[in-house]
Amino acid sequence: MRKMLTAVLSHVFSGMVQKPALRGLLSSLKFSNDATCDIKKCDLYRLEEGPPTSTVLTRAEALKYYRTMQVIRRMELKADQLYKQKFIRGFCHLCDGQEACCVGLEAGINPTDHVITSYRAHGFCYTRGLSVKSILAELTGRKGGCAKGKGGSMHMYGKNFYGGNGIVGAQVPLGAGVAFACKYLKNGQVCLALYGDGAANQGQVFEAYNMSALWKLPCVFICENNLYGMGTSNERSAASTDYHKKGFIIPGLRVNGMDILCVREATKFAADHCRSGKGPIVMELQTYRYHGHSMSDPGISYRSREEVHNVRSKSDPIMLLRERIISNNLSNIEELKEIDADVKKEVEDAAQFATTDPEPAVEDIANYLYHQDPPFEVRGAHKWLKYKSHS
């Protein structure tokens, strides 16, 4: 009788697991719902207390973060491939290796908050809500791109995301302006203004620091310190590489930018600081890019292959999260491999769209220059050629 009952139950459950929803339900029963994780303490400047040194990671959060980071990694590697196949032309700056920054920052703020960054923007485009399809299509200059094929790699925009900016450091005072708008409107929102260590010595950055401190603007200045500004190491370009201290009277913190949980908790802390009316704060994210500065830079003339390999093998952000997930029984290798396969298909489908979607028509070149009805004559257009639509 017992053998018969066992056989029946085995048959029932084997049939159930063929259905994805039930399979997911059954698999989740053997995993922990959450785990308390220790994270590295941040270095503080002009702060008595900083972010916590432990945090709770739920299973749902872990799988979401893992998938998002894998999407960004595969999307950037696909962009590398499309560039080499000449589907992508012009400038192209990839962020593989820095995924914990993109995902951790978004996890620490609200969708209604604001983000502005430099030309290394693809990952932030995705975390701000743009699809892989629209990002890759923008890279290939197609109509289905997030900027209708007119912005390319460096000029992508989305809801509460202001680029993608091509001039080194130029986005920082713009971010201070967005923060000024938040304070003026009294909406309780903050702006994350990101820049690299190469831009950290720009004069306009310090001007933005000053005005933000003077007016107590809700701006989180974030230096993504990946150790190199183009091909120059930060030790050769900066008298001090303590970027979290460069705000002078503005408090700051230095964060392990390869650990998504460190980034998330530091971002929450910084955003709360700004929302409380204390003014701006500076965050330095210690991170690393695997590619060169851009696709025209092989990235090995100013650093060794051994250096890159060492970072990949010891500090890769996706690897660190995967190990944390498995060690805390939030998932297993089999489930994570299923996510990997799903991500691979999503990126491949997006790449297919990005290489077959039509390019914008020539007649469309003067469209979308103005928000509302523009003057009939459009500056920069051929003086003998007038387009039917300019809006």
Swiss-Prot record:
Testis. Pyruvate dehydrogenase activity is inhibited by phosphorylation of PDHA2; it is reactivated by dephosphorylation. One of its GO terms (cellular component) is mitochondrial matrix. Its EC number is 1.2.4.1. Thiamine diphosphate binds at residues 119-120, 166, 168, 197-199, 226, 293. Residues 1-30 form a transit peptide. Its main location: mitochondrion. It catalyses: N(6)-[(R)-lipoyl]-L-lysyl-[protein] + pyruvate + H(+) = N(6)-[(R)-S(8)-acetyldihydrolipoyl]-L-lysyl-[protein] + CO2. Keywords: Carbohydrate metabolism, Glucose metabolism, Magnesium, Metal-binding, Mitochondrion, Oxidoreductase, Phosphoprotein, Pyruvate, Thiamine pyrophosphate, Transit peptide, Tricarboxylic acid cycle. Pyruvate binds at residues 93, 119-120, 158, 166, 168, 197-199, 226, 228. GO terms for molecular function: metal ion binding; pyruvate dehydrogenase (acetyl-transferring) activity; pyruvate dehydrogenase (NAD+) activity. It is an enzyme of class 1 (oxidoreductase). Signal peptide: none annotated. The modification Phosphoserine is found at residues 294, 296, 301. Mg(2+) binds at residues 197, 226, 228. It is found in: Mitochondrion matrix. PANTHER family: PYRUVATE DEHYDROGENASE E1 COMPONENT SUBUNIT ALPHA, TESTIS-SPECIFIC FORM, MITOCHONDRIAL, PYRUVATE DEHYDROGENASE E1 COMPONENT, ALPHA SUBUNIT BACTERIAL AND ORGANELLAR. The pyruvate dehydrogenase complex catalyzes the overall conversion of pyruvate to acetyl-CoA and CO(2), and thereby links the glycolytic pathway to the tricarboxylic cycle. Heterotetramer of two PDHA2 and two PDHB subunits. The heterotetramer interacts with DLAT, and is part of the multimeric pyruvate dehydrogenase complex that contains multiple copies of pyruvate dehydrogenase (E1), dihydrolipoamide acetyltransferase (DLAT, E2) and lipoamide dehydrogenase (DLD, E3). These subunits are bound to an inner core composed of about 48 DLAT and 12 PDHX molecules. This is Pyruvate dehydrogenase E1 component subunit alpha, testis-specific form, mitochondrial. It comes from Mus musculus. The gene is Pdha2.
